[in-house]
């Protein structure tokens, strides 16, 4: 399995975090494998080069989680805290969608970013 992800609104938020940390607890994944499959690999599949990693030029999106509670504690987006200890502070979520979904989000007044998924073989080494 290259990536852990959800397929949109029918799946509750944070299911990837909760389920992924349960896999870590069961020794199905190491913590490093979980982080890679929940962040870096989905970003690569969706050709989002500024997402899924912490490095110079990246978007500075970070989720700090409590591994015991299997829940987010703090979320930083673009360098700004947008969620902490159950409270949403500010910011507007951005939907990631293919071209076919852009009109739907625009009609709803929800910011959306077009993604072009890659079906090329992934570089799994780094």
Regions found by a protein language model. Name each.
Residues 12-18, 22-126:
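Active-site microenvironment of metallo-dependent hydrolases
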Residues 9:
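Active-site beta-loop-alpha junctions enriched in small/polar residues
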Residues 2-6:
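Hydrophobic faces of well-ordered beta-strands that scaffold small-molecule active sites
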């Amino acid at each position: 399995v290259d990536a852990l992800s959800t397929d949109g609104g029918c799946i509750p938020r944070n299911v990837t975090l909760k389920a992924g940390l349960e896999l870590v607890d069961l020794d199905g994944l190491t913590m490093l494998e979980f982080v890679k499959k929940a962040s870096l690999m989905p970003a690569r599949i969706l050709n989002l080069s500024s997402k899924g990693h912490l490095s110079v030029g990246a978007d500075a999106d970070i989720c700090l989680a409590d591994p015991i509670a299997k829940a987010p504690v703090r979320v930083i987006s673009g360098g700004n805290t947008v969620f902490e200890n159950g409270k949403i502070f500010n910011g507007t979520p951005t939907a990631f969608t293919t071209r076919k979904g852009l009109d739907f989000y625009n009609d709803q007044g929800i910011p959306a970013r077009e993604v072009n998924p890659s079906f090329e073989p992934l570089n799994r080494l780094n």
